[in-house]
């Protein structure tokens, strides 16, 4: 299975670095769809199955980028709840590892298991192992996939904070044969 993984379009919380209570209530903000299709989307094959996180911003991104395409929601692609970090009083990019670990318990193994469960769900919906899928999800999973395949040995905090790999809104990576083979930046 070849996977093209796209991070959802930006929200005001992304832009402002806000940690929000209601992750699924965030709507996307305007972005230039023509520019995205020219810089990023032109690298997609014509035929693919579309899978998305259940978050509102992922559904809105799917409808904006692929208005005529049906999609399947994959629960295991859901965002992780980091709202406890609100108690720190910081913007997301101001949080250090000690503060993160004080408020959040998020073992790397559980994150990897969710990604593997998501892959299993997607594979079950494909007609063959050779199908191409497009996934619209969260930046965290994009960075995690890079971590898994590049073996950087980063902590969960490092992955969240893009220590060795940045994956911005509307960026896309191609994953084939258990490695990241291309990354396109919006």
Describe every region a protein language model picked out.
Residues 153-186:
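Domain-level recognition of soluble alpha/beta enzyme cores
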Residues 7, 74-77, 176, 184:
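Residues at the C-termini of beta-strands that transition into short coil/loop
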Residues 9-12, 55-58, 78-80, 139-142, ...:
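Short, solvent-exposed loop/turn segments at secondary-structure junctions
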Residues 2-74, 103, 107, 168:
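Active-site-proximal alpha-helix that buttresses catalytic centers in soluble enzyme cores
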Residues 20-31, 65-121, 161:
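Phosphate-handling substructures
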Residues 2-6, 51, 130-141:
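Beta-strand elements within well-structured catalytic alpha/beta cores of enzymes
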